[in-house]
Amino acid sequence: MESTTSSPQPPPSDALEAFPQKSMEPADIVVLVLYFLFVLAVGLWSTVRTKRDTVKGYFLAGGDMVWWPVGASLFASNVGSGHFIGLAGSGAAVGISVAAYELNGLFSVLMLAWIFLPIYIAGQVTTMPEYLKRRFGGSRIPITLASIYPSTHSLTILQVDMYAGAIFIQQSLHLDLYLAIVGLLAVTALYTVAGGLAAVIYTDALQTVIMLIGAFILMGYSFAAVGGMEGLKDQYFLALASNRSENSSCGLPREDAFHIFRDPLTSDLPWPGILFGMSIPSLWYWCTDQVIVQRSLAAKNLSHAKGGSLMAAYLKVLPLFLMVFPGMVSRILFPDQVACAHPDICQRVCSNPSGCSDIAYPKLVLELLPTGLRGLMMAVMVAALMSSLTSIFNSASTIFTMDLWHHIRPRASERELMIVGRVFVLALVLVSILWIPVVQASQGGQLFIYIQSISSYLQPPVAVVFIMGCFWKRTNEKGAFSGLILGLLLGLVRLILDFVYVQPRCDQPDDRPAVVKDVHYLYFSMILSSTTLITVFTVSWFTETPSKEMVSRLTWFTRHEPVAQKDSVPPENPLSLTISQNGTTEATGISIQLESVQEATTKAHSDGVSPKQSKVLKAILWLCGMEKDKEEPPSKVEPVIVSLEENPLVKTLLDVNCIVCISCAIFLWGYFA
């Protein structure tokens, strides 16, 4: 008699095909094309209406954004296609615990506006490396971070979002992967290069609306298919692949699938790690990452920046319902594909022997939605991908131009800075295209967990340096640099070990070293943060005290101090001006950049005749916001946000709203704990 527990025989290939000959209907294609045209029109509209011929106008949207586009851009910059694919995939695989990242981010984005942003505004900084330059002096720390920021985003967030978007585009449209990605990058780079941050923020606002509409529609279809939340809870634990081995635990739903807080030793996300290990990388992302902070600095004043953070915080409640729960529904509806447990079968289903949970969201879209709505959700995924790409392109360009290039060429003219910023965006596009083969080879069973583990190895040291610099006046350059380098080295060692000793599949023994196998990445984040903090504290305590100029208006406790009238550290950023105690600007901080621009302009027009230009050159200069007839030296340089003053009534309303938002988050933590 044959054993009933033998290895399962794969069913016919057509039953295993995750996307069985699904193709977009003409109506879907029309919706997608209309979306592309609409986004491009909005991007070009913002390009025409905004001031792009200055460094501040291009990199900080002129500093006149109101709260709602700032909030929408914060949310869209955070929630890329990796969220849709990754959160839904992790929900299908392990349940709702992954939503802890979103609820944790809710607190962090509020801390940005209420705690960290006032320090940045008081210090008159436009980039995060610039803050560290003014806070600690020297060039070691800002140059180190200015080098890390673009590479970190390009090789992690950019990589994941491109792969996630490629899953959707390639399988639904049956396009060549390179063709799909190159097309997206081309459109994205066009309005990023042309319009700067203003174009990015306006298109982010549009894409946030599209993402939310599409995601709400799919959530409704998903819950209707399983009978609501009660049906989801009843059926999720029965969602098993029919071809799994009966004597194997692989592919079984977790018993704690509907709980966020899980066992501290044996679970996939231990609760101490969620509370503490997750918080430090979250603070890095929301409070010190250039992509996020740059959007808040583009607000017209502190109240609008707070309003934007509040809007983003409320929206951070939604991913649990819009992405995680639909991913769990997908496992119920398509268990043989989404919940496949045998490596050979998974390889045939999605070309990934580790598991196919990451196809959960695309599977719902392509199988559940009717014609037309399917095209809308394609637009949603494209919107999510393009939002992330524009955020990375613009912010990486800002850091390279304002911190690295300006350090190399301190007398660079404003025109040169504008050209360098745009060329760097094009260079990132080229790197992104060349990175596609690596994206294809790096797909894992849970995409979202992949990026979070990498973040836990690289971000805590940077976050600790910012925290110590903002809240302990005794922190000096030697302590911060020592802690930063030690932390980054330890994180790189763990990262390399993770790549060398790959996590085995469910049906394989785990022979990895104990430091990799037994130390969860969130626990390692706690260890790394503690080590960095102790190093910064110890070295700073036993070395010289920072000068007053490196502390005044650059910490939480000194943000209201009057500006030093002499012996102050000269700002190296061409946007900086001195701000008086009452918030008015003074002319003492004008950068050498203006002198260079004025000198060049005077020389070019000394004979009273403007040089002739070809029509092609004129078009290119207009696209980049650098028309020849606009080469006039500005009469003054406007600061980003010049005052910490707020209207008392508005401040009270914002504070009350902040308390309400935090209360909602605490309720959700408790309800799903």
Swiss-Prot record:
It catalyses: myo-inositol(out) + 2 Na(+)(out) = myo-inositol(in) + 2 Na(+)(in); 1D-chiro-inositol(out) + 2 Na(+)(out) = 1D-chiro-inositol(in) + 2 Na(+)(in); D-glucose(out) + 2 Na(+)(out) = D-glucose(in) + 2 Na(+)(in); D-xylose(out) + 2 Na(+)(out) = D-xylose(in) + 2 Na(+)(in). It is a multi-pass membrane protein. Its main location: membrane. The chain crosses the membrane at residues 28-48, 57-77, 79-99, 103-123, 181-201, 209-229, 273-293, 309-329, 376-396, 419-439, 447-467, 480-500, 522-542, 653-673. Expressed in kidney and small intestine. It holds the Pfam family SSF. GO terms for molecular function: D-glucose:sodium symporter activity; myo-inositol transmembrane transporter activity. It comes from the Eukaryota. NCBIfam families: sss. Involved in the sodium-dependent cotransport of myo-inositol (MI) with a Na(+):MI stoichiometry of 2:1. Exclusively responsible for apical MI transport and absorption in intestine. Can also transport D-chiro-inositol (DCI) but not L-fucose. Exhibits stereospecific cotransport of both D-glucose and D-xylose. May induce apoptosis through the TNF-alpha, PDCD1 pathway. May play a role in the regulation of MI concentration in serum, involving reabsorption in at least the proximal tubule of the kidney. This is Sodium/myo-inositol cotransporter 2. It comes from Rattus norvegicus. The gene is Slc5a11.
